[in-house]
Amino acid sequence: MYSFFIDGMELPIAPQKLTVKIKGNNKTLTLINEGDINFLRAPGLTEITFDAVLPMLGQYSFANGYRRPDSYLNKLESLMTDKEPFRFLVSRVAPSGRLLYDTNMKVSLENYTVTEDATKGPDVTVSITLKQYISYSTKTVTVVKPKPEKKPVVQQLSLIHI
């Protein structure tokens, strides 16, 4: 059993498919007469995509009770406009109840598309794209100028001839 949480809000139906794309940042360079070489770099930000079904009618059994699709859509809109990262969690549990593993990542909502298709009933489908968010901050550095070295004062003596 899968449970999906977006900023603490559990999706009513776990998406059928979850795609996690880990972007490589390696750089390929072509050498004269030597072919290609690959410079290995740290991976890029992870991108997560899935389609969430938001039931229009409360005819299903839900863990936390029925919520109308507009409550989920309002949450997605606020995540987009607030410009703040949030937690995305996927909990995977075996039929025996044993926890398999989790995906727990700080993300941003990159985009979402709302689709209503009359051929598929009254439910709303939302295609969601999330991107991994890595916290960063600026650091203030104070540059201290070194004090000039004190050189010993040498007095010049003049010799007087008698």
Question: What is the meaning of each model-derived region?
Answer:
Residues 1-160:
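Compositionally biased, intrinsically disordered low-complexity segments enriched in polar/Pro/Gly
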